[in-house]
A protein has these predicted regions:
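Conserved SAM/SAH cofactor-binding pocket of Class I
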Residues: 120-191
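N-terminal auxiliary segments of SAM/dcSAM-dependent transferases
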Residues: 2-100
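SAM-dependent Rossmann-like transferase core, predominantly class I methyltransferases
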Residues: 65-137, 141-143, 147-148
Length: 191
């Protein structure tokens, strides 16, 4: 809680200096991006120490060992991590644990750290409602969480090949499809 308050105070201080107006839209955009970059750089400088097992050796620090292990794998020594990174990691851990309701699926998807989360439903609804040319075979390229493959399987597609390049996404998609009971119709493949 204190760390988040410190980060918010730093953000408020960084936001005191708005970008200067440009003489053209392109220059205004450049100044805006420059200000955003400076803000991100400053906020990224607040570092938190981690022990080998991801314990935070600070008084009253929360236990983030499980969240860190899910995101980074086994610990490999002491490290310094940006507080913003740790806060994102905690959010990803909560999403993974609780899942995100996907109305078009009628179920929850549990995104893993580093895998795009289906929080905007427009593209999911499009796949859920679009007419399908065939029920025999579909491909989900860049499957991520596997949400689109799951929707296609629930719509009656006989065989779906879901691909991704990221090992985290492949692990995430497999876990979601297994939890949803759809592994008999969806094959998850490394691209």
């Amino acid at each position: 809680q204190n760390a988040r308050q410190l980060l918010n105070a730093m953000a408020r201080r960084a936001d005191r200096h708005p970008p200067k107006p440009g003489t053209s839209p392109a220059e205004s955009f450049h100044f805006h991006r420059q200000t955003q970059s400076r803000r991100a750089r400053i906020l990224g400088m607040l570092l938190v120490p981690l022990e080998e097992d991801y314990e935070i050796p600070l008084r009253r620090a929360p236990d983030l060992r499980l969240a860190c292990t899910e995101a980074y794998g086994p610990g490999e020594g002491q490290a310094l991590v940006s507080l913003r990174e740790l806060l994102g990691l905690v959010g990803a851990h909560e999403w993974r644990k609780n899942g995100i309701v996907v109305p078009a699926l009628g179920d929850r998807i549990h995104p893993h750290y580093g895998v795009f989360s289906p929080i905007r439903s427009e593209y999911v609804d499009l796949v859920a409602d679009a007419p399908l040319p065939s029920n025999a075979l579909a491909f989900d390229i860049g499957t991520g969480t596997g949400v689109l493959a799951a929707i296609l399987a629930r719509r009656g597609i006989a065989r779906i090949v879901a691909t991704d390049q990221d090992p985290r996404a492949l692990t995430c998609a497999r876990a979601n499809l297994e939890r949803l009971g759809l592994t008999d119709r969806v094959e998850v493949v490394q691209a």
